Amino acid sequence: MLWYHLHIFGNNILFSGLYENQEDRQTIRVIEKNGIRFSLLAYTFGVNETTNYKSIQKQLKTYPYILGQLNKEQIKEDVNNAKAQSDVVIVAVHWGKEGHSELSDLQQEYAHYFADLGVDVVIGNHPHLIQPIEKINHTLVIYSLGNFLSTMKDVYNQLEGMVCFDFVKKEDEISIENIQYVPLVNHYNDNVVTIYSLKEYTSTLASQHSILKDQADIIKEFKNYVKQMISNDDIDIEMWGLYEEKNKSININNLYGWWYCFFLS
């Protein structure tokens, strides 16, 4: 199954975190856009205990290179290699506790470790809920964006986020500017899934949602939850669709961000 996923996309998608051999494991994924070189790294705390859990664990013992795991020594080597080849280092990380909006000790430990190594952006997932955003030194840490396409059953599994920001290069310095957070709703009925921005989501749509249909004030609750979870006095984050006086025109199809997918435009 692991080998199948390595080849299913061919050369059409650059991805990181799953590797075919040791040489592939040591190859940093680099992409250049608008004169800026980006390195993409990916790690996980482990694998879920699914029906083929024992088989995967056996593969990992036999072929430890196939999966990017949270190992500080390996991470340090990867980040140093990435920094030598690129201007920006982005890390996707599978961490935290499922169903918990609070940060785990492991998340906080590794967030600070990535920051100490000089990683530019950390984008996390696994909790299936949105979690805070913060800056540690110069590292932007997005702890969890929640789900994207999902038929999970809890109310707050339907609330998710996308993050948009600019990398600005001035001489030899690169900064992260214009951070925008776009709350999304995972809408489904009869297992047909559609993604809406929270700004566009209506009470009529909510009444047709398989999970949200009995939640009378869910749109208001979602907005309050996003404000509570994402607002950060230390970072200028525009909360798209939550504060009308700050709204700007955003093409939602061109936004950057979601879990392990990076769109550079």
What are the residue ranges of the model-derived segments?
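Intrinsic disorder/low-complexity segments enriched in polar/charged and small flexible residues
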Residues: 242, 260-261
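Acidic, metal/ion-coordinating pockets
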Residues: 1-247
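Acidic, low-complexity intrinsically disordered regions
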Residues: 236, 254-255
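Targeting/processing segments of secretory and organellar proteins
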Residues: 248-253, 259
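Intrinsically disordered, low-complexity segments enriched in serine/threonine/proline/glycine
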Residues: 246, 262-264
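Tryptophan (W) side chains
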Residues: 3, 258-259
